[in-house]
């Protein structure tokens, strides 16, 4: 029997140079929910995401249940090969994850026709960030950790990301998302704030 997806965090703290980045945190997130980590720059949002991803050491308890495979993560560094074309990037990640999704479908969904054979180095910041969501789309996992996913995105790409988030939540996925944004993101169904 498949375990229900959940994340339980108890008394989580993280220190750098013996200084606490944030006060001890405790919260629970279940499948079909998004935890919205709000706050100004420098308040520990990225540090918290890194702790949950296992990228930083911490004190306290972080307990994942029902996670199938790996956790999808999008942060500030994209991990893109600048010399690679967009097409090569898409083809590579489709193969890595064994995705059955057609390349044409991805190119159309993410509006990549006009840059398909361009080297990634020629793309704007927002276009590069969009490619990280292409990778997440192929990954097809149930937990997403998204650190400031809307920064550098134009209105059309923001809409695309909003739709991906809403779809993921409605399909019983879980999202932990950090942002300093206000507005529509706060209105996504089944959202908890931290």
Where are these regions (language model features)?
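Hydrophobic anchor residue at the start of the ABC signature
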Residues: 133, 172
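Conserved ABC ATPase signature
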Residues: 119-128
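ABC-family nucleotide-binding domains
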Residues: 41, 147, 153-154
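Conserved ABC ATPase "signature" region
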Residues: 101-116
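Q-loop/switch helix immediately C-terminal to the Walker
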Residues: 77, 82-100
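Conserved structural motif at the start of ABC-family nucleotide-binding domains
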Residues: 7-9, 21-24, 153
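Walker B catalytic motif
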Residues: 148-149, 165
